[in-house]
Amino acid sequence: MTPVTFYTKNNCPQCKGTKMLLESKKIEYTERNIDENEGYRLEAQATGFFNVPIIVPSPDSGIKSWSGFKPDELKKLI
């Protein structure tokens, strides 16, 4: 199973759906809320994505990062 960094923000339905799926599949994640931490917002911008949720798998996984609620991509992390 591949751990991920999960960029989110307050009141984001896609973020809530992604978090529920991560938890239901028992995928290890670190949540970084860009509304609550300026440093996390800058990190999220550095990914090149402009919309949350942003999922960044561990670098050694070989899985590319993505933005948005994508259940099929999340399944690759299992």
Where are these regions (language model features)?
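Conserved segment of the thioredoxin-like fold in thiol-based oxidoreductases
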Residues: 17-32, 49-52, 65
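Thioredoxin-like thiol-disulfide oxidoreductase module
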Residues: 33-50
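A short glycine-rich beta-strand->turn/loop micro-motif centered on a GG-aromatic cluster
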Residues: 7-8, 29-37
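Cytosolic beta-strand hydrophobic patch enriched in CBS
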Residues: 53-57
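Local sequence-structure signature of Cys/Sec-based thiol-disulfide redox active-site neighborhoods
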Residues: 1-27
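Short alpha-helical
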Residues: 13, 38-39, 72
